[in-house]
A protein has these predicted regions:
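N-terminal segments that cap or nucleate solenoid repeat domains
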Residues: 2-49, 54-59
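Ankyrin-repeat boundary/"N-cap" motif
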Residues: 5-12, 35-48, 69-80, 101-107, ...
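Ankyrin repeat A-helix N-terminal signature
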Residues: 14-19, 44-52, 79-85, 111-117, ...
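Ankyrin repeat domain, specifically the short helix-to-loop turn at the C-terminus of the second helix
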Residues: 25-33, 57-65, 89-97, 122-130, ...
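A structural signal for the main folded, soluble domain(s) of proteins
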Residues: 69, 78, 82, 87, ...
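Internal alpha-helical scaffold/solenoid segments in large eukaryotic proteins
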Residues: 93-134, 139
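Ankyrin repeat (ANK) tandem arrays and their immediately adjacent linkers/low-complexity segments
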Residues: 134-354
Length: 354
């Protein structure tokens, strides 16, 4: 008898979409029940999004362990919890462990919360999932969800928070801090939301502020592109933060040169110091090279400062690595130029897409 394959066929995704149960069962004439996707995750059919209930039942009856782990230790129920699929309920009925964590200590409830699946969170709570279980970072499902939540997820986040707190999760000061970050994220991107969506998110944020005792975030005031650009901060760092909130759009380039020099230095700072230069490319280099040009516009910086900016830029290598203080000084020079040029200067064509 020929040895069966340990990996699923490459077109298994397509077979799932078609949904022909007999064709799916036939896969296992040549594949082991434990056959996985052949990728790094080692996902069996039970881990797949959209796997038909009939196939799930058949595989388990044939002997496939309902709690078989993937590469990271995630069970099928764990994976389905991230998708928010009703397959979670079926797997539970078949013996799926609602508490079994992955190798990092994340339980199915952690994943349902982090992926903002309120219906799955409700089901897992009803079935006795430990709402206070902590992963290796010491996060409960609630804290984990708040940590990764952006403003766009405020509505399901509020629903999940109410359920978990009602189930016995203790509120901590750290949670209030996370809620304020969620509020700031939404305010920064508010213009990208429809009026109806804004109302929904505002309502959800109000709930979150009240639940966690967090300070409500003030609505963002965006520069009109015409009025003089004025700041109140007494230090350049305070002024930089003011200018960022005032001039930077949620996506794409700024409308004014003033906004763009602030945006460029901020984007480069984030890519180098937070992201380690992983996405560094020609666009980032072109952004940097535009700074001395902008610093020479309008009421220009001194020749010494413009030359300094060129030297600083040259110290950022081709992998996006820079000496300490280089980006900080460029940010400071950007603020200095904006202060010298309060009247908005429209941004022309650019040769980058970051």
């Amino acid at each position: 008898m020929a040895k069966k394959r340990v990996t699923l066929p490459k077109d298994f995704d397509e077979l799932l979409k078609v949904g022909d149960i007999e064709a799916l069962k036939a896969v296992y004439d040549k594949c082991e029940l434990t056959a996985y996707d052949g990728k790094f995750g080692l996902h069996t059919a039970l881990h797949y999004k959209g796997v038909p209930d009939e196939l799930v039942i058949w595989l388990v009856k044939q002997g496939l362990d309902v709690n078989i782990p993937d590469y990271y230790g995630g069970t099928p129920l764990y994976s389905q919890a991230t998708f928010g699929m009703d397959t979670v309920k079926l797997l539970y009925e078949l013996g799926g462990d609602i508490q079994k964590p992955d190798r990092y200590g994340n339980t199915p409830l952690h994943m349902a919360a982090e992926y903002f699946r309120p219906n799955t969170v409700r089901f897992l709570i009803e079935k006795g999932a430990d709402v206070n279980a902590k992963n290796e970072r010491g996060e409960t499902p609630l804290l984990a969800a708040l940590t990764v939540c952006g403003g766009i997820r405020a509505v399901p986040m509020a629903q999940i928070a109410e359920m978990l707190i009602k189930a016995g999760v203790e509120i901590t000061p750290e949670m209030a801090e996370k809620v304020e970050i969620i509020g700031k994220d939404f305010e920064f991107h508010r213009d990208d939301f429809s009026e109806a969506s804004c109302e929904e998110v505002d309502t959800a944020l109000s709930k979150l502020y009240n639940i966690f005792g967090a300070k409500p975030v003030a609505k963002r005031i965006i520069h009109d592109g015409v009025s003089p650009i004025l700041v109140k901060g007494s230090t350049w760092k305070e002024q930089y933060n003011e200018l960022w909130d005032l001039l930077i759009p949620s996506t794409g380039a700024a409308k004014t040169v003033q906004g763009e020099v602030i945006r460029i230095t901020g984007r480069v700072d984030d890519e180098i110091n937070r992201n380690g230069g992983i996405n560094w490319d020609r666009s980032y280099r072109n952004m940097l090279n535009s700074l001395p040009v902008h610093f020479a516009e309008g009421n220009a910086l001194s020749e010494k400062e413009i030359e300094e900016s060129k030297v600083l830029i040259s110290k950022i290598d081709g992998k996006g690595l820079a000496e300490d203080g280089v980006i900080t000084r460029l940010c400071e020079l950007a603020v200095s130029w904006v202060i010298l040029n309060p009247n908005p200067i429209p941004l022309g064509e650019i040769n980058y897409n970051r």
